[in-house]
């Protein structure tokens, strides 16, 4: 399963972009609207945490700037009647912390601002979110690309490496070395540095 993609931005079309890795492989990645608006010019470097959606006729990659956003997308698409396109539309309108606040504040109608979601569907989604979203993380659900407490950086980067197939012992050892040398790294930076170190060691 593809969980992380990093490379050069080759093309943007609609709500998707094409990322060409350093190995020359190009991936079409669908991203939320706010991420689309912040993409660099063609040729710039981009990186995404990936959720892979497999259908009978297609394999689609959905990319997110933070691990929290990716995990929220997975929660959303686990809800009946919420497909990948709807999940992406919701995350184009609301960040993960916004969704948690909606749950805490019991603001069902806010979801109807998302195109294609009526009141009945919003109520259904909201009911599921109450049980599936980690509202106890509010207000400090730190995004992977903006840093946070060192322990949180280590924990989230370790989870990212585990999802890429690395063993906990190996990944933990490399991450500790990385963060010892560069303690101010955010999660995205720590993950990239660890991946480079792991690649050199193999």
From Swiss-Prot:
Q: Name one GO biological process term.
A: DNA repair
Q: Does the keyword Phosphoprotein apply?
A: no
Report residue spans for region: Domain I: 1-65
Region of interest: Domain II: 66-144
Q: Where is this region: Flexible linker?
A: 145-155
Purpose of the protein: The RuvA-RuvB-RuvC complex processes Holliday junction (HJ) DNA during genetic recombination and DNA repair, while the RuvA-RuvB complex plays an important role in the rescue of blocked DNA replication forks via replication fork reversal (RFR). RuvA specifically binds to HJ cruciform DNA, conferring on it an open structure. The RuvB hexamer acts as an ATP-dependent pump, pulling dsDNA into and through the RuvAB complex. HJ branch migration allows RuvC to scan DNA until it finds its consensus sequence, where it cleaves and resolves the cruciform DNA.
Task: Give the NCBIfam families listed for this entry.
Answer: ruvA
| Name of this protein | Holliday junction branch migration complex subunit RuvA
Question: Per the entry's comment, what about the domains?
Answer: Has three domains with a flexible linker between the domains II and III and assumes an 'L' shape. Domain III is highly mobile and contacts RuvB.
Sorted alphabetically, the keyword list is: Cytoplasm, DNA damage, DNA recombination, DNA repair, DNA-binding
As for family, the record states: Belongs to the RuvA family.
**Which Gene Ontology cellular component terms are annotated?**
cytoplasm; Holliday junction helicase complex; Holliday junction resolvase complex
GO terms (molecular function) for this protein are: ATP binding; four-way junction DNA binding; four-way junction helicase activity
